[in-house]
Amino acid sequence: MDPTSKSGLNQVSDVVFVIEGTANLGPYFESLRNNYILPTIEYFNGGPPAETDFGGDYGGTQYGLVVFNTVDCAPESYVQCHAPTSSAFEFVSWIDSIQFMGGGAESCSLIAEGLSVALQLFDDFKKMREQIGQTHKVCVLLCNSPPYLLPAVESVSYTGCTADSLVQIIRDRGIHFSVIAPRKLPALRSLFERASSVAGLPESSHPDYSQDPFHMVLVRGIALPVAPGGGSVPVSLKPVLPPQSLPVNQNPLVPVASTAPQMNTFQNVSLHAAHDAAQKALEEAANQQQKNRFGQISTPPFSQSPVLPPGGKPSLSTVTTVSPPVLTQQQVPPQQPQQQTQVPQPGLPAVNQQPPQASQQQPNNQQTPPPTQPGMAAVPAPPPGAQQGVANKVVAWSGVLEWQEKPKASSMDSNTKLTRSLPCQVQVSQGENLNTDQWPQKLIMQLIPQQLLTTLGPLFRNSRMVQFLFTNKDMESLKGLFRIMTSGFAGCVHFPHSAPCEVRVLMLLYSSRKRIFMGLIPNDQSGFVNGIRQVITNHKQVQQQRSMQPGQVQPNQNFLNRPPGPIPVTHGNVPQQLRAAATGNQQAPVTGAPPNQVQGQAQAPGGGMLRLQNPGANPQLRSLLLSQQPQGGMQGMQGMHPIQQMVHAAPGGGAQMQPQWRQPHQGPLMVPTGPRGPVTQNPGMPSVSSVMEDEILMDLI
């Protein structure tokens, strides 16, 4: 088997999925998606995709999607191709949007067309990666049909090539070719074998990744969860990760002393008992955590099969889901390499979910740094942000991060703010040059709702990333920071103008994918500052427009504070007016139009003018409404729409006014009633108008 590259966290990869978009694959796609596609994406992404993750266009994993059909799709194109993206979340949305149609009358599919376009994507990747050099390239074919014996015709560079010749080109270019199918097709297996290098291992040595006995899963360059009952032998076939981290990736329920020789020895027939014990533990873990594969961002799907191949993800995806009793067992033997198991304990997920265990284990983690991994020497102790085991990081800056948040105690004044601070470090990868000599000792952070930053995506991509690590000396502040950063806020760190440093602004985000606090330093500092100012200015203008729209009621607090009297009756405000009328004991007799005319006038605009909770069902309510108007109703109509003035005219003129507004405005009457935002606000959309957020936005401007 071709040696796999190091797993996705520290590797630059180019991944292209070639998927058959016909109805032949549609019934099986959900199973393939959950068992193979999502684990593959998480393998390269470092964890479950999250919408708030920001990745660089040139330094992270690039994903491409090619969807091919059959010859019966004419006159449509044979292939649909999506432009490369660095967002795993966006890539998953592309895959979920595939519509499997056609192909029911065909026994083959246009695999050659799909592979030819995939090769063109890899050519584009090569141009994008000129500054990086060699990357880990993977092409995954998902289909349920054998290929036509026809050459590709739609590709520009590979016209005339058949599927067999295309997989040979894929092999010659060092691209790892994988095949996933819901059934075992000899033609697809032949394609996979043609893409094998001469020095590859025999087919019997490939791990059995299939989660269903009917599935055919032949992969290279990817580490998937090993199928229950078939993963004991292939575990030792891909020793790619460093030996000191391999025991952590094995089943945590088995002593590491028995799994370490298993990883260092390719074929050791004397460890069948250890394999059996590992297999039983694997099945138990899979049964317990199968349902949590992709439902929660904080629970990576690899937790269902802790016995990963050595080419699998490092400890981020596996160890962070280990239960506290298992961690306690792993900490007993002192000779075991524990730097990986210590990482999730002081990390913020442990702070959020298991505070007792985290508080008990953190002192031990800080006082006994593992001497077994040389890469950890650069970090004095794993603070609670070093969830990944920062093996190749160096400290670029040390200081204090300060921010303000609203206190949780309801007894305190709502305008009072609680100032928190945490000692922190900024770390960069080895070889990177970040000049922090002029950075202040204290960084002041202001919180911004992430929904305001969605338009600044290009500026985020054109930025360099650093890692923030925090100590666990103040657990309350650490919990507060984690709670805020995971509830839709981002931190904007402003550097004072008095500091003569190149960086003027830095964004602090919590990456649920990598489980770290990462700082993004935009390369275009002035453009980023202007972008934030523009976003905040636009937000304030929208807020002002909402509060100043004519004919609409101000927020409920202002409305309740108004004295009773003649006020405009608009959307949904009848109960307040009724309350005001009742307190004033205004019981004027009803004269003029009959009640049925009033009811017709109120209902004719389609609920836009006068929206009663139950129109026509409360005659007392109608009489109170009508009794309000003669006492100076013209004063209340001055700020109303002309059509509203007609509707809310004195009751005596109701009969005359009714034909005037019904005939010319019966059709478009619902349009000029104005926006109904303040009344029909969706409670699910978080409003960015709280006291804390408004003050933050004012400070940023």
From Swiss-Prot:
Residues 314-367, 593-604 have a biased composition (Low complexity). One of its GO terms (biological process) is positive regulation of transcription by RNA polymerase II. Its main location: nucleus. Residues 286-306, 679-689 have a biased composition (Polar residues). It is found in: Nucleus. The keyword Nucleotide-binding does not apply. Gene3D superfamilies: Mediator complex subunit 25, ACID domain, von Willebrand factor, type A domain. A motif (LXXLL motif) lies at residues 621-625. It holds the Pfam family Med25. Signal peptide: none annotated. SUPFAM superfamilies: vWA-like (SSF53300). Keywords: Activator, Nucleus, Transcription, Transcription regulation. GO terms for cellular component: mediator complex; transcription regulator complex. Residues 277-388, 580-617, 650-689 are annotated as: Disordered. Component of the Mediator complex, a coactivator involved in the regulated transcription of nearly all RNA polymerase II-dependent genes. Mediator functions as a bridge to convey information from gene-specific regulatory proteins to the basal RNA polymerase II transcription machinery. Mediator is recruited to promoters by direct interactions with regulatory proteins and serves as a scaffold for the assembly of a functional preinitiation complex with RNA polymerase II and the general transcription factors. Component of the Mediator complex. Belongs to the Mediator complex subunit 25 family. This is Mediator of RNA polymerase II transcription subunit 25. The gene is med25.
